[in-house]
């Protein structure tokens, strides 16, 4: 059995760790509210852009934007992967990466090549290590991400798709469901899915200047950027939620460990006292 001093040192060490996990839990709890507000604020814009694209696509029946055309054969697939910059978020990033590797392998088994661009330090580090063909990366996105920081990596994929180098693009991120649940999501980004039935058959009374095709050309890139930005906000909210839950679990485990160590310490102290009394009694009897 360890000595009382050693056990006391272990208890002190765990208590210090608990202070850190509690602080991280409280910080994440504070940040998640702000992240949720940003996420909810941007949703109406993304939804409105989706409706506009549906109007324009239907209004310009004689013109098909390249982003709306399905390729007959998929020879190369691109993934835009969104992760966090920091760890201590449970299995949030690793679960996403594991599913993505499975999806990439499925495409490779069909004979398709795979390209990736990563957003976030964790994704960049992971996929460089597994030697995936990375064609772009951006890190240090922060808790309040800016759209401007994403435009470069988004353009890499859009240009490759427009030039016919990539036949399909997926957006991979953690969708925020609630504080306890975050879901790894794979959304097809390009070609854009067909307009919903109610959008496609609605009677829109709009005038387009100079024409629907020209407006569609300008709006389409903004729409793709808004989808990626919305996914990034969802991922940031998911990160804070996962970290809050992970740190609470760590704090609970620290409490349990401290209790167990305290019990061991009490037993060791009791044994030492018993031994000391026995020695005193034995010495007195010898006299």
Swiss-Prot record:
Primary location group: membrane
KW Cell inner membrane (keyword) present: yes
Cell compartment(s), UniProt: Cell inner membrane
Cellular component terms per the entry's GO annotation: plasma membrane; proton-transporting ATP synthase complex
Keyword Ion transport among record annotations: yes
Molecular-function annotations in GO: ATP binding; proton-transporting ATP synthase activity, rotational mechanism
Function: Produces ATP from ADP in the presence of a proton gradient across the membrane. The gamma chain is believed to be important in regulating ATPase activity and the flow of protons through the CF(0) complex.
Subunit text: F-type ATPases have 2 components, CF(1) - the catalytic core - and CF(0) - the membrane proton channel. CF(1) has five subunits: alpha(3), beta(3), gamma(1), delta(1), epsilon(1). CF(0) has three main subunits: a, b and c.
Protein name: ATP synthase gamma chain
Gene from which this protein is expressed: atpG
